[in-house]
Swiss-Prot record:
It comes from Rhodococcus erythropolis (strain PR4 / NBRC 100887). Transmembrane segments: none annotated. This is ATP synthase subunit beta. Keywords: ATP synthesis, ATP-binding, Cell membrane, CF(1), Hydrogen ion transport, Ion transport, Membrane, Nucleotide-binding, Translocase, Transport. GO terms for molecular function: ATP binding; ATP hydrolysis activity; proton-transporting ATP synthase activity, rotational mechanism. Produces ATP from ADP in the presence of a proton gradient across the membrane. The catalytic sites are hosted primarily by the beta subunits. It is found in: Cell membrane.
């Protein structure tokens, strides 16, 4: 074996030891190194390959030490053209990404390469993507509400500033739209910094998101990191860590409050499952990797608030076949401060966001944190909706006429509440033709208190559809009466 000197990703040059490829199985590559020169776990290795039309550098991440100077690595790019005997050099450090203001307004891949401006950030500061979570004595003990202006969220499943929020739902119920709405609201209302991680989702969605953010003028405050559906599992497994590293810099060095959006955390788990099988690990329940809980914990424990600064994470979580007992969503539940469950039946009723008010939860929905009035109104809304749910079987079999008079009143009130929990989104303006509404929390509590007391039972149910505040409801009712 020979020693070589290699460029260290634009961060200066370092002595790098050369190994050689001994086996290639899809994205998993075994590499042999000289005795005493075996690279550390998570180090990035570089392999130069030449295809008929182009020469390129593959990045391999060390995943296992096999013994006899062999390491098993996972490739971050397709391994087409990689053959046994190809020289591999150790960079001496983990995969590193650019950090700081330079990443705002740009699109990166999991390796930290800028996709819209090639080479951007490589001559500046870079951080490795494998980092330890903040020390226990550095964590923030204070609990604050993150006000979103979305009624159903602020009232029934309030988000924690510096917390972890899960958006659960099957395919097509509105997870990505809700994330796009949150990015827009945070940028417009709070002038905050956002980092978006596209993990294993459709390339088209990434393009749409970039164009929409550009149109709305919020791109300059957001860093986008993509490892999409067509990427190898190694990239999909690491892209969330790359985005989180950028967010940590804004929190720890610049002292900013950051929002980290991950779409979709299920694809992170799925990529880990693919890699685990190729690495020869025995599968666990439903075919998932045996290290599922550890991998999820390593990611989630880094998303937290430190003294005076926070990373608030909003994670879209695809639920396979709408089965919440699947190990992927079930493992994520343990780390979350709030869960927003998107319901297909509510979506089919045309109520957006299609949040299920009865199954969505928040650990801060208690009087000591949100206040006695907020807690009382939220519980009254849930009580009315729960009673309506219990009566639905009777209504379906016998009809409304068989209900007692007080139950008829309650059903009408519940339907008004159900419709009033929806509202127009800013990102949907071009589709609906209606301006998006931002409702202050104080107004939300007062409005639902009045609706629960029956002050608006005389207005038609349809007047409550996609309205912001009660003024919008009354205006819609007058318009309907005029027709």
């Amino acid at each position: 074996m020979t020693a070589a000197v290699t460029e260290n990703n634009g961060a200066g040059s370092a002595s790098a030891v050369a190994g050689r490829v001994v086996r290639v199985i899809g994205p998993v590559v075994d590499v042999e190194f000289p005795r005493g020169a075996v690279p550390e776990l998570f180090n990035a290795l570089n392999a130069e390959i030449t295809l008929p039309s182009v020469a390129k550098t593959l990045t391999l991440e060390v995943a296992q030490h096999l013994g006899d100077n062999l390491v098993r690595t996972v490739s971050m790019q397709p391994t087409d053209g990689l053959v046994r005997g190809t020289a591999v050099t150790d960079s001496g450090k983990p995969i590193s990404v650019p950090v700081g203001d330079v990443v705002k307004g740009h699109v990166f891949n999991a390796l930290g390469d800028c996709l819209d401006t090639p080479g951007l950030g490589r001559d500046g500061e870079q951080w490795g993507i494998h980092r330890k979570p903040p020390a226990f004595d550095q964590l923030e003990g204070k609990t604050e509400i993150l006000e979103t202006g979305i009624k159903v969220i602020d009232l029934l499943t309030p988000y924690v500033k510096g917390g972890k929020i899960g958006l659960f739902g099957g395919a097509g119920v509105g997870k990505t739209v809700l994330i796009q709405e949150m990015i827009t609201r945070i940028a417009r209302e709070f002038s905050g910094t956002s980092v978006f991680a596209g993990v294993g989702e459709r390339t088209r969605e990434g393009t749409d998101l970039h164009l929409e953010m550009e149109e709305m003028g919020v791109l300059q405050d957001t860093a986008l990191v993509f490892g999409q559906m067509d990427e190898p599992p190694g990239t999909r497994m690491r892209v969330a860590l790359s985005a989180l590293t950028m967010a940590e810099y804004f929190r720890d060095v610049q002292g900013q409050d950051v929002l980290l959006f991950i779409d979709n955390i299920f694809r992170f788990t799925q990529a880990g499952s693919e890699v685990s099988t190729l690495l020869g690990r025995m599968p666990s329940a439903v075919g998932y990797q045996p290290t599922l809980a550890d991998e999820m914990g390593e990611l989630q424990e880094r998303i937290t608030s430190t003294r005076g600064r926070s990373i608030t994470s909003l994670q879209a979580i695809y639920v396979p076949a709408d089965d919440y007992t699947d190990p992927a969503p079930a493992t994520t539940f343990a780390h979350l401060d709030a869960t927003t469950e998107l319901s297909r039946p509510i979506s089919q009723m045309g109520i957006y966001p299609a949040v299920d008010p009865l199954s969505s939860t928040s650990r801060i929905l208690e009087p000591g944190i949100v206040g006695a009035e907020h807690f009382r109104v939220a519980n009254e809304v849930k009580r009315i909706l729960q009673k309506y749910k219990e009566l639905q079987d009777i209504i379906a079999i016998l009809g409304m006429d068989e209900l007692q008079e007080e139950d008829k009143v309650l059903v009408g009130r519940a339907r008004r509440i159900q419709k009033f929990l929806g509202q127009n989104f800013i990102v949907a303006e071009k589709f609906t033709g209606e301006p998006g509404s931002v409702v202050p929390l104080r107004d939300t509590i007062e409005a639902f208190d009045r609706v629960c007391k029956g002050e608006f039972d005389h207005l038609p149910e349809q007047a409550f559809n996609s309205c912001g505040g009660l003024d919008d409801v009354e205006a819609a009712a007058k318009k309907m009466a005029g027709k």
